[in-house]
Amino acid sequence: MSYWETTGHSDEWYTPTYVFDALGCAFDMDVAAPEDRTHVCTPAKRFITSDSLLQRWSGFIWMNPPFGGRNALAPWLDKFFDHGDGIALTPDRTSAPWFQDAWRRADAVLFTRKIRFIRPDGTPGVSPSNGTALWGSGARANGALQRAAHEGLGVLARPVRLIDWRDFA
């Protein structure tokens, strides 16, 4: 089990500035923001700081949700893809059921190197045990992920929509 699958002292790990610089876009809303945003650099106009899954999301969103325990990301990703306009950040746990479900719904996914997230006190954290996936939903997200790939942030992949294999038999 990875560190992010266990319950720790805090689920607050902030995205470093260079990720947003590579994306080159601004967001209408950060749907998983902390109350104290002193060390948060998300370029967003509005911030949801509590009960986000119960709130109405609008516009082009940024989502770096609490990773929590096993399958804690599933409800966040379900709401993200239902919303259909934004970029989400998660671990790149390709064998996890939530990851495979999200893969089927994504327009694009950017696989990054390990990101040293920012602690609530503003200091960089240690290198995580795995890489990160940035999920794109909608045209603006696709453009931002394409730009980030060109900037060298990661490798861009697009899920293949499965068709009935019997059509080829």
Go through each PLM region and give its residues.
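Class I S-adenosyl-L-methionine-dependent methyltransferase catalytic core
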Residues: 1-169
